[in-house]
Amino acid sequence: MGSLKLVCAVLLCMMVAAPVARASLTCPQIKGNLTPCVLYLKNGGVLPPSCCKGVRAVNDASRTTSDRQSACNCLKDTAKGIAGLNPNLAAGLPGKCGVNIPYKISPSTNCNNVK
């Protein structure tokens, strides 16, 4: 009986001390966060505050190299699929929102080089 209590106590300590896994954003979540940006990326004009909120959310969730590379690949693939996308507006979007990302949002970006 005493050894069962010890095993339970050890397991409980392991569960409490284990690091909590943080889920990364999925590509559909990234696209959802950036949907308010599409009209701006095509036509320019006024940048919606909801767009910058989405840009910040994606940046905040992209903490590791793997997260940033995944976000980059999602943005790259999404940019390829938006007819009429202005590449200069896409590349400048993070800066317009006060966010610094380590890559250019472009269909030609090599996301494997993102750190």
From Swiss-Prot:
Family indicated by similarity: Belongs to the plant LTP family.
Entry-linked InterPro entries: Bifun_inhib/LTP/seed_sf (IPR036312), Bifunc_inhib/LTP/seed_store (IPR016140), Plant_nsLTP (IPR000528)
pH effect on activity, per entry: Stable at low pH. Refolds at pH 2.5 after thermal denaturation. Thermal denaturation is irreversible at pH 7.5.
Signal peptide positions on this chain: 1-23
Molecular-function GO term, any one: lipid binding
Protein name stated in the entry: Non-specific lipid-transfer protein Cor a 8.0101
Tissue: Expressed in seed (at protein level). Expressed in seed.
GO cellular component, one term: extraorganismal space
